Structure formats: C-alpha cells, structure tokens
UniProtKB/Swiss-Prot annotation:
It comes from Alcanivorax borkumensis (strain ATCC 700651 / DSM 11573 / NCIMB 13689 / SK2). This is Erythronate-4-phosphate dehydrogenase. Its EC number is 1.1.1.290. Keywords: Cytoplasm, NAD, Oxidoreductase, Pyridoxine biosynthesis. It catalyses: 4-phospho-D-erythronate + NAD(+) = (R)-3-hydroxy-2-oxo-4-phosphooxybutanoate + NADH + H(+). Pathway: Cofactor biosynthesis; pyridoxine 5'-phosphate biosynthesis; pyridoxine 5'-phosphate from D-erythrose 4-phosphate: step 2/5. HAMAP family: PdxB.
Amino acid sequence: MHIIADANMPGLEPFEAFATVERVDGRSLTREQLGDADVLLVRSVTRVDRALLAGSQVKFVGSATIGTDHVDLAYLSEAGIQFAHAPGCNARAVAEYVLQAVLLLCARQGREVQGARVAVVGLGNVGRRVADWLSALGMEVRGCDPLLDAQGYAGPVALAPLDDLLDADIITLHVPLTQSGEHATGHLLDASRLSRLGPGQMLINTCRGPVIDNLALSQQLASGTGPMTVLDVWETEPQVPATLYQQVVMGSPHIAGYSLEGKLKGTSMLYDAVCQWSGQGIASGTAMADAPPLNPAVNSEADLLALLQVAYRLEDDHRRLGESLHDTDPSAAFDRLRKHYPVRHELHYWQYDGSVDDTWRAIISRLFEPD
C-alpha cells in the first residue's frame, strides 16, 4: 500500500508496518505527486476535489481535522472514494485556547469572569466542551446551533437564535464553514450583525476565518466601535491583513488546536479508519512520557491563567504572528509558523496536585481529567 501524507502530521509511524508512507507539503500538493498512491492523508491546507484526484488511484482519503470544508465530499462519494476525518481530535486544545483568551480579555476589561454572559455559537465537539468549561467557571452560557435544535437537543446549554445572543458579553465561534443552505455559516457575522457588537463585548473565532466578514470587522474596529477580538483564523489565510492583526487584541496562525495530543489523536483516528477499511494494521496507541507534577495553588483568575500558561501562552503566538508579517513573504511565513510550531501539551499531560479554592475546583477537575 502506498500512502501519501502531509509532512506536518505526527504519529505516522504505525502506518509504516503495512505501507510505504511518503510525506509531502500539503499546501502545494499536486495530482502528479499522487502517482500510484492508494491513500491520501491531509490537513485543512489541502483542497481535496476532482481537480486533485481525478485519474489517480486514490481509494481512501483521510483528513486529520474536525472540519471538512476543504474536502469535496460529493465528489468523493461519486468517485467511490472512502473518506474519514477526526471530529473532536483537538477539542481540548481549542477549549484551552478559548479559556485562556477569555481570561486575558476579561483581565483587559477589568471584568470578573464569573457571571459574564457567553454565547457559544456551534455546539459540536469543541463548542460543547467550551460551554461546559465556561459554565464551570460560573459564567452564564447560552448556545446557538439550529441544526442541533432541529434534532430536539435537550442538553445542558439553553439554545437561542444567533440574533438573540448578540448582546452577550463574550461571543465564541465553533461552527463548520458552509457556504450554502438555510444555515450557511460563511459571513455568519456580517457587517449587519457586527454593527450590533460594541467595545464592551468580546469576540473569539477559532473555527474558520470566513465565518466572520473580516473586512467589515476591520472597518468596525478602525472606527473604535468594535468588540475586543481574538482571531486564530483569518478569511484570507495564509495571508493575514496587517491592519486587522494590529486591530485585534490577540491573533494567532490557525493553531488553536495544535496540541501534540490533539495532532496525535487525529492521526490515530485516521490510522484506525485505514485499518478498518483495508483490513491491515493493529490497534493504535501512542504512549506519552511521564511529566512532572504541577502544584501551583489556584485561588484566583490570575492563578488559573498562570496555570494555563504553563502549557501554552497565547501572547507568544500573537508575537510570532506579528513578526511573520514583516517577512518578505508573509504567507510562506504563516505556513512556517504552523509547520515548525513548538511542542505544546494539553494540561492533562501533567498530574496536578496543587491546592484549589472551591470556586475553581470544577474547572480544574475538567482541565486535568483524562480523555
């Protein structure tokens, strides 16, 4: 079996027990490179469609991602090509990113997190975890997910139409990118909806850049009437508008889910899918080295933020992205930031044995519980 895989995917070694694995640059992959490959493993930077696959021998496509907007699923079905992806693989990493962003933004505003009103837009694997964690912080969480609502959702998060949630203190986006249908999410936050947000509010986007009209957002931020904003995703990435970067509180190069555990879990889910499809291979599993315990006390929001930053500092990614914009080729620099991203662990990699005030016990329990 011949497998072509994005070189930025870790944990590909188990495939080598039954296949030849060829690692390639996912963003620049061409049909000619596919050759006699049976399996193609990608990330979100590779557009998988008829133009790439027609005439190839590829019989299985796997994407180590939550979203599938980069894959033409209709074409794969038409061509009889099996498909698998990795829903929820990096949900914890994204939730940790959002939690840190919330704490940073609240600190900037001098606002306590407890009692703040949050709108979680999209209640998939990531959105549900974010909603649960922010609820554990004592925040008032409501959600928007019309597809889930139509299925008779009866979960712990109260649902409401998006337009009824635009007065929330914090709006965090966790939807797939879709450009058609009754509930399309392209420019879900368009100029009209953005105009209803003000500087006392906070906006976080970690799903897909085009979910927000970036030009309209930039114009509103320039006028001084826009919300405090954190963007991990950009409508024109890998090109990041320098003006918009300067306007947001924090920006990063589409890495919210870039924990080592999340990446390995995504690859492992594809490994299991390929094994099931091909009848080859054995159950996967990647052992992590034992990590030293963490024991700082958590008695305040500042303590919780400091604990999160043991694993990851959002400010570091903001700085690195800003530096990349001065490169002679900022788009290539954006990709390099992702390709050479520092190893980042999720908090549950460590064992926590510090003292915790009762106020923070629920969130600490969630952060360190095993998968």
